[in-house]
């Protein structure tokens, strides 16, 4: 940590980490991990694995900072910052605060006048949006859909008439039911893209209608991390005509689309 004048506060750095492959880490991330003295990590094992994969020797004191402890550990981290200690905030994958811990600490630091900066990098949201082939000029990120059925139905009903492309996170085991509910609220023919295991060895990008994708997801276990992209009302994929010309089926539930045969899992 650089020398500071007495009374000068530390800096909170939000560090984006790879969403799949360790080698996607930026040189700046490698440098910051190497020199960090305090790391607030969603999963301490994950940050140690990442450091080992990057041949980085961690010298930092690592503080566990996940959803269940975020509220009670924020004051302590804020005190560290106010005492002049820099804090590097990392999550399991992607950017802190985006469906991951970080918001509370950032809000508290901002209110206290702490300097906050970002070490930009991978994001499953923009990665999925970019490869989807759906319009990218306007979009909304919806995170994980609500767990309670009533809340989910209300949320989907509100979004059904939205003209923006929608991006969701979902687990593999809930994907089929989510796609079925979206088909009921948004229309069976609404275009969507399932992005599974983005940037990883078993990455899969599957395009189709909500109904077709729901049928595919319901036909076998879908494993891995899912980012779902759904077209806005009245908006179509810019590559839809190309997909048809290469023989891809309109419904992914029968023959799959351009990125490979139907996949039942793993």
Regions found by a protein language model. Give the residues of each.
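Glycine-rich, flexible N-terminal cofactor/catalytic loop recognition
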Residues: 1-67
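Alpha-helix capping/helix-boundary segments
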Residues: 45-47, 94-95, 124, 174, ...
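A contiguous loop/helix-start segment that scaffolds small-molecule binding in enzyme catalytic cores
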Residues: 2-10, 61, 85-86, 164-165, ...
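Class I SAM-dependent methyltransferase SAM-binding "motif I" and its flanking Rossmann-like core
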Residues: 103-162
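Conserved helicase motor
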Residues: 63-72, 145-149
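Short active-site oxyanion
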Residues: 33-39, 113-117, 165-166
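Short beta-strand scaffold positions
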Residues: 41-42, 100, 169
